[in-house]
A protein has these predicted regions:
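Short histidine/acidic/glycine/proline-rich micro-motifs that form metal-
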Residues: 121-123, 153-158, 234-235, 262-266, ...
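PAPS/PAP-binding and catalytic site of the sulfotransferase fold
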Residues: 99-112, 163-172, 191-194, 234-285, ...
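Short glycine/proline-rich turn/loop motifs
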Residues: 80-85, 221-231, 311-322
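Generic structural signal for small/hydrophobic residues in well-ordered secondary structure
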Residues: 99-100, 136, 150, 167, ...
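The conserved 3'-phosphoadenosine-5'-phosphosulfate
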Residues: 246-336, 343, 348-352
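PAPS-dependent sulfotransferase catalytic domain
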Residues: 130-141, 201-275, 283-287, 329
Length: 352
């Protein structure tokens, strides 16, 4: 029996471009409003079915590029689809420089995910202005009961210090929390270098590389001899994952927290995305063939439902072996503690 017809606005013509998973014609040339109520799950391999699934599950009409939220459906249709602005039931809470933002952008392509288009950093402002749960909810996208609402905040893992209590209070003890953890030495260096580049714009010549190395040694390497956390710098502190995870486990059970291996994501993104889908209770959408590695930038990219590569990160200078060894020696007991708590060996734990 044919699905009942719904009077819905037509999507904008999407010039989807040629793709091995579907045709290159525009969405409106085949759009059938009846698809809003009846779709089969081949949305991960066929661009037509993907658009139909987005239309069925979402409160927005897909636009080009598909990473954008799209245009909101008219009010009458939103009411019939029970569209509401809901508080997040899941959040990607870091860690900075470990790929969490990229993973979140990929997740937003899933038809069953309604996610904010940018980090709101809402919990940084609790206590200032209007930071009530209602104010937070009104910053969320509309979603249907077929979707989960998500937010991302790459600094939340570390700060504010009472972030676990705030998330539990504003959302729920059952909210799903995703942390992306990567090699702490590499994370530390990438974070420090990013800040250095903000203060010293432009390409680095030989003298500048020497200056960077000296500043890094003074700021980070020398601080590894300090055992008081409040005397270490922020870059070093954030890479001591276990101390922050303990605060989160005081408020949430292990069933509510997923630690994603950021280094493994670069090697096998489909596998890590499936772990996230299973954790969130989503249908499996992402496939191995969706991802590829950009040889020019080294970045993990996606080619379905539309090709997207994140901006290239600036490459930091390599550390000398003695410096790497010193940092490895510093982080090893903390990594061992993380292994004990998570009961999960990260691929990067073998780097030192």
């Amino acid at each position: 029996m044919d699905a009942p017809r719904i009077d819905a606005p037509r999507p904008n013509d999407l010039e989807l471009g040629p793709n091995k998973y579907g045709d290159s014609e525009s969405a409106s040339s085949w759009f059938n409003p009846g698809a809003l109520l009846s779709t089969s799950w081949d949305a991960s391999s066929n661009i037509r079915r993907y658009i139909a699934e987005r239309l069925s599950a979402s409160c927005y009409i897909p636009s080009n590029p598909l990473f954008q939220q799209g245009s909101i459906m008219k009010k009458s249709l939103r009411e019939r689809k029970s569209c509401k602005q809901r508080l997040p039931s899941a959040i990607v809470a870091g860690v900075k420089k470990c790929g969490g933002q990229q993973i979140y952008q990929f997740l937003r392509l899933h038809p069953q995910v309604a996610g904010t288009e940018k980090d709101l950093n809402f919990f940084d402002n609790v206590g200032y202005n209007d930071t009530s749960p209602e104010a937070y909810r009104l910053q969320m996208p509309y979603s249907t009961t077929k979707q989960i609402t998500m937010d991302a905040d790459q600094s939340l893992f570390q700060r504010p210090y009472n972030a676990p209590q705030l998330v539990r209070k504003f959302l729920s003890p059952n909210v799903k929390i995703i942390f992306v953890l990567c090699d702490p030495v590499e994370r530390l260096l990438a974070d420090y270098f990013s800040q250095w580049m903000k203060e010293n714009s432009g390409l680095m010549n030989r003298d500048e590389r020497v200056t960077f190395a000296m500043r890094f040694q003074a700021s980070a390497l020398d601080k590894t001899q300090t055992f008081r956390m409040d005397e270490r710098n922020e870059f070093l502190d954030l890479s001591v994952y276990v101390q922050h995870l303990i605060r989160w486990l005081q408020q949430f059970t292990t069933d509510s927290i997923l630690a994603v291996d950021g280094d493994l994501f670069k090697l096998n993104p489909a596998s890590e995305m499936k772990k996230i889908e299973d954790f969130l209770g989503l249908r499996n959408f992402f496939r191995k063939g969706h991802f590829f590695n950009n040889d020019n930038t080294g970045q993990t990219c996606i080619n379905f439902p539309q090709q997207f590569c994140p901006p290239r990160a600036k490459q930091h200078p390599e550390l000398e072996d003695w410096a790497t060894n010193k940092l490895c020696e510093f982080f090893k007991p903390y990594n061992d503690g993380l292994l004990d708590i998570l009961n999960q060996r990260m691929s990067w734990m073998n780097n030192c």
